[in-house]
Curated annotation (Swiss-Prot):
GO molecular function: ADP binding; ATP binding; proton-transporting ATP synthase activity, rotational mechanism
Location(s) in or outside the cell: Cell membrane
A Pfam family it matches: ATP-synt_ab_N
Keywords: ATP synthesis, ATP-binding, Cell membrane, CF(1), Hydrogen ion transport, Ion transport, Membrane, Nucleotide-binding, Translocase, Transport
InterPro entries: ATP_synth_asu-like_sf, ATP_synth_asu_C, ATP_synth_asu_C_sf, ATP_synth_F1_a_nt-bd_dom, ATP_synth_F1_asu, ATPase_a/bsu_AS, ATPase_F1/V1/A1_a/bsu_N, ATPase_F1/V1/A1_a/bsu_N_sf
Main subcellular location of this protein, as a coarse class: membrane
Homology family: Belongs to the ATPase alpha/beta chains family.
Record EC number: 7.1.2.2
Protein name: ATP synthase subunit alpha
GO cellular component: plasma membrane; proton-transporting ATP synthase complex
């Protein structure tokens, strides 16, 4: 069998005609320096600020410093395998995280990867972690209440859906407990909660997850964790990942609560990155744009207009102070960004007043308009009662011969402090808060011994569940105070069966 030359040439021609060349062009640079989670690369001339880049071993990085002859990159993962001379290529993408209802009930890292051992998260939706906050015309005034279940907050510093309320205090003053109680209280409220743990011990995060699971709150909660052992870039990105996951629900008309625990550690991580990138340091060695770090995060919390679906994203940022110093750089920055703050004081905490909320310095700038009418009526005099009690308490230590009016104020104040105390993970429905505060402010508790107030309240709530369900239902549905006669009948009815301790 002989093969003719023309057949061979015809076959070659056919192969040439069918040949398609796919040339993949990518911008490639070279690592010239690496260490401490930072790499510098030469040759990435067209890279965007905030663009994802990929190292030759598959680890991703984020382009941050665009300089004349090199690019400063923060490495999002282990950096020990990256060497000088390694290749680094542009991806053309900016940082995105997975979003959607598939994340609910899961524990993820700031890149959206699951860390709870429950398998992969089956979602294809993603959102960029840096996105502009809603504009003025896309927003609406805060008018719906977000019930925390904590009497001292719902009565004195009410929070509305779409508000930013700072929780500030020293370490070990119960900041995380306030957030967990608020999340637990959102059961049956059609609220999605996101808890962002920044720079915490992994054992602490584990305890938080178990607490949420025990109270059935993990069914509507996403936990984003960047623990203390993780590189600084992940601590810096964690809050942005959390708010991005929340925005997906907000723009779909849902209500979201995001807790950032805590932003002091994020600021410290950002300071570390900035100093390693050789950015000029400012006050307390923080970079000049540390205010923008927090403002662009917290401005993404909003109550959207009806045209945008009417969703909301409420932010509860935490700041840890040193020895109660709220005039430091980061605390003053975040106080000026938020719509109010709740101060937790260590001396109150250690004296047994828990939650240790300082009513004098805590304020809510927009939450008052979101408070239900019943609550605003019964809590009107609380702040004054507490303030005059604290003032008179100091004088009462010097003299024993006090007039009747002063003694009455001291007695009312002592009972107010007792009523505002609350057990850990025992959030209270708003209708029960209204009734006990009504009893307090209208003088029904003045003849109950101070030592019995807590027991009186617990037994009263149980009694209401079986004997005054119609009164509870009326407050819950109308959100207004019922007739004084109904309240008096319920409170006096219970006082008849309550046995005071000797």
């Amino acid at each position: 069998m002989s093969i003719r030359a023309e057949e061979i040439s015809a076959l070659i021609k056919q192969q040439i005609e069918n040949y398609q060349s796919e040339i993949e062009v990518s911008d490639v640079g070279t690592v010239i320096q690496v260490g401490d989670g930072i790499a510098r690369a030469h040759g990435l001339d067209n890279v965007m600020a905030g663009e994802l880049v990929e190292f030759s071993n598959g680890v991703m990085g984020l382009a941050q410093n665009l300089e004349e002859n090199n690019v400063g990159i923060i490495i999002l993962g282990p950096y020990t395998e990256i060497r000088e001379g390694d290749e680094v290529r542009r991806t053309g993408r900016i940082m995105q995280v997975p979003v959607g209802k598939e994340l609910i009930g899961r524990v993820v890292n700031p890149l959206g990867q699951p860390v709870d051992g429950l398998g992969p998260i089956n979602t294809t939706n993603t959102r960029p972690i840096e996105s502009p906050a809603p504009g003025v015309m896309d927003r609406k005034s805060v008018h719906e209440p977000l019930q925390t279940g904590i009497k001292a907050i719902d009565a004195l510093v009410p929070i509305g859906r779409g508000q930013r309320e700072l929780i500030i205090g020293d370490r070990q003053t119960g900041k995380t407990a306030v957030a967990l109680d608020t999340i637990i209280n959102q059961k049956d409220e059609d609220m999605i909660c996101i808890y962002v743990a920044i720079g915490q011990k992994e054992s602490t995060v584990r305890n938080v997850v178990e607490t949420l699971r025990k109270h059935g709150a993990l069914e509507y909660t996403i936990v984003v964790t960047a623990s203390a052992s993780q590189p600084a870039p992940l601590l810096y990105l964690a809050p942005y990942a959390g708010v991005t996951m929340g925005e997906e629900f907000m723009y779909n008309g849902k209500h979201v609560l995001v807790v950032y625990d805590d932003l002091s550690k994020q600021a410290a991580a950002y300071r570390e990155l900035s100093l390693l990138l050789r950015r000029p340091p400012g006050r307390e060695a923080y970079p000049g744009d540390v205010f923008y770090l927090h403002s662009r995060l917290l401005e993404r919390a909003a109550k959207l207009s009806d045209a945008k679906g009417g969703g909301s994203l409420t932010a509860l940022p935490f700041i840890e102070t040193q020895a109660g110093d709220v005039s430091a750089y980061i605390p003053t920055n975040v106080i000026s960004i938020t719509d109010g703050q709740i101060f937790l004081q260590s001396d109150l905490f250690f004296s047994g007043v828990r939650p240790a909320i300082d009513a004098g310095t805590s304020v809510s700038r927009v939450g008052g308009s979101a408070q239900i009418k019943a609550m605003s009526k019964v809590s009107g005099t609380l702040r004054l009662d507490l303030a005059s009690y604290r003032e008179l308490e100091a004088f009462a230590q010097f003299g024993s011969d006090l007039d009747k009016a002063t003694q009455a104020k001291l007695n009312r104040g002592a009972r107010t402090v007792e009523v505002l105390k609350q057990g850990l993970h025992k959030p209270l429905r708003v209708e029960k808060q209204v009734i006990i505060l009504y009893a307090l402010t209208r003088g029904f508790l003045d003849d109950i011994p101070v030592v019995d107030i807590t027991r009186f309240e617990e037994e009263f709530h149980a009694w209401l569940d079986s004997n005054a369900t119609d009164l509870l239902e009326e407050i819950r549905t109308t959100k207004k105070l019922a007739d004084d006669d109904k309240f008096a009948a319920a409170i006096n009815g219970f006082k008849k069966v309550f046995v005071a301790s000797e």
